[in-house]
Amino acid sequence: THSQVHTAEYYINMAEKLIAEGAQEICLKDMAGIGRPTVLGQIVKSIKTNHPEIVVQYHGHTGPGFSVASMLEVAKAGGDVFDVAMEPLSWGMVHPDVITISEMFKAEGFKVPEINMKAYMEARRLTQSFMDDFLGYFIDPRNRFMSSLLVGCGLPGGMMGSLLAGLKGVHAGINSNLKAQGKAELNEDELLVQLFDEVKYIWPKLGNPPLVTPFSQYVKNVA
């Protein structure tokens, strides 16, 4: 994650401690996708410079829009493993698509295995059939979209479905209360922005916990 606490120095020191304890692989889990690309590159460069034998993996979600640039910075700094996705589940609040990342790495001169497009399309077809059959009922359609609003609040895209469902549940009650006070009612977008602002405000007051389960739900619920 990214905050006044979670700096490059903080993560570099943490990695050094883990390696000293015997870790052979370090995974940078950028669960909300708000890690700044240049900072991620600095972290990986430090690890690979001091410990070239350590395998470095990057896992970052696409919600706020940093992930493609982050993957490029991590790769250029010596990253080894990158978590990607494929259609129809790539992008949105998930991961960049393997095709895009593969072509980007090739353009930078990295050796990347060729994608079996026949297998890709078959897996794509099967996944879409599951979504059309039953899986789609459990996926909020707005999770298909990226949102720069997530940059400030730092919430992971994976919890957006439950967050939006929760807002729907309280929306009418909030507007009823506002109306009783003679105040203007809020539409869903206005309510969402206010919640994001409140998360951004309350997060440091709760100690800047990494916004991943269960802390992301806790911070969101307090907000």
Which residues are covered by each model-predicted region?
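Catalytic cores and adjacent flexible loops of soluble metabolic enzymes
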Residues: 1-223
